From Swiss-Prot:
It comes from Vibrio cholerae serotype O1 (strain ATCC 39315 / El Tor Inaba N16961). L-ornithine binds at N169, D233, S237, M238. Carbamoyl phosphate binds at S57, T58, R59, T60, Q84, R108, H135, P136, T137, Q138, C275, L276, R320. Keywords: Amino-acid biosynthesis, Arginine biosynthesis, Cytoplasm, Transferase. The lineage of its organism: Bacteria, Pseudomonadati, Pseudomonadota, Gammaproteobacteria, Vibrionales. Transmembrane segments: none annotated. This is Ornithine carbamoyltransferase. The gene is argF. Belongs to the aspartate/ornithine carbamoyltransferase superfamily. OTCase family. Pathway: Amino-acid biosynthesis; L-arginine biosynthesis; L-arginine from L-ornithine and carbamoyl phosphate: step 1/3. Pfam families: OTCace, OTCace_N.
């Protein structure tokens, strides 16, 4: 390997250099090609991996499980009600127990400090499947998808806008990813929903070294102009109270990604991205409640955009598999 990431944790992109991130993206593309060609080599044969989920998941769980199986590893799923973590046993103690039984551990849950403790004490590679602050495996998938749809542009030549709740783990992580890779990112959101000042300052310092451009704005037209990609996420995140909806919907409605926003980019080849799940129709229980209460068909994105030729959300979702596999292979593979 050009870079030795063996035995490294993957907790947040701030811990990795641009060259290391590029290496993981290149490895992801290589593993994706091998899977399609049927030539994949099993580099995790005989490895045992624990998947800790204190928050439920579809894409992250499936991606980790299939990636592990493809590479020859065995997994143990530890769900929200399947352990004593935080109830009868601290994460520090849990880490030291699981680290003696498993070769690698994935954690999806709440505070970033929890996965940091796990990474400090486990003694084996720990991978962040999502915390309240960061979602680094998603960003790798996003960057790989942007490379695939970049029309010969390099990442540092791309412009993209994130609309909506920019203080959540996706806003934070996309800003970090853009800063690391020298990209032009616009965080388009109400000022109260911008990332915290300390993280913005950290990313601005990184941007000085990489040539990235970070813009925070409340103006949709200004923010999306000339973009190659538009990105959004749900307006109310996992674990937030139900009574947050009314205020949030009223505040975020101007930041919905609809066809007017697509056209405002001035780029007929612009692509739409979303980490999923998305509230874009009334085919779910939540979607029906939204339609009944707010008279809206879709929240953060309209059905028209979600199902349009601009949308690449399912290619993006598939890339969770390939990038997660790359992280496991790079840090644990033989």
């Amino acid at each position: 390997m050009a870079f030795n990431l063996r035995n490294r944790n993957f907790l947040k992109l701030l811990d990795f250099t641009p060259k290391e991130i590029h290496f993981l993206l290149d490895l992801s593309a290589e593993l994706k090609r091998a899977k399609y060609a049927g030539t994949e080599q099993k580099t995790l044969q005989g490895k045992n991996i624990a998947l800790i989920f204190e928050k439920s998941s579809t894409r992250t769980r499936c991606a980790f499980e299939v990636a592990a199986f493809d590479q020859g590893a065995q997994v143990s799923y530890i769900g929200p009600s399947g352990s004593q973590i935080g109830h009868k046993e601290s994460m520090k103690d849990t880490a030291r127990v699981l680290g003696r039984m498993y070769d690698g551990i994935q954690y999806r849950g709440f505070g970033q400090e929890i996965v940091e403790v796990l990474g400090q004490y486990a003694g084996v590679p720990v991978w962040n499947g999502l915390t309240d602050e960061f979602h680094p495996t998603q960003i790798l998938a996003d960057l790989l998808t942007m490379q695939e749809y970049g029309r010969s542009k390099q990442l540092h030549e791309m412009k993209f806008a994130y609309l909506g709740d920019a203080r959540n783990n996706m806003g934070n992580s996309l800003m970090v990813g853009a800063a690391k890779m020298g990209m032009d990112i616009r965080l388009v959101a109400p000022k109260a929903y911008w990332p915290n000042d300390a993280l913005v300052a950290t990313c601005q310092e990184i941007a000085k070294q990489t040539g990235a451009k970070i813009t925070l704005t409340e103006e949709v037209q200004e923010g999306v102009k000339g973009c190659d990609f538009l990105y959004t996420d749900v307006w109310v995140s996992m674990g937030e109270a139900a009574d947050a909806w009314d205020e949030r919907v009223a505040l975020m409605k101007p930041y919905q990604v609809n066809m007017d926003v697509i056209k405002a980019t001035g780029n007929p080849q612009v692509k739409f991205m979303h980490c999923l799940p998305a509230f874009h129709d009334d085919q779910t229980k939540v979607g029906q409640e939204i339609a009944a209460k707010y008279g809206m068909q879709g929240l953060e994105v309209t059905e028209e955009v979600f199902e349009s030729e601009y949308s690449i959300v399912f290619d993006e979702a598939e890339n969770r598999l390939h990038t997660i596999k790359a992280v496991m292979v790079a840090t644990l593979g033989q």
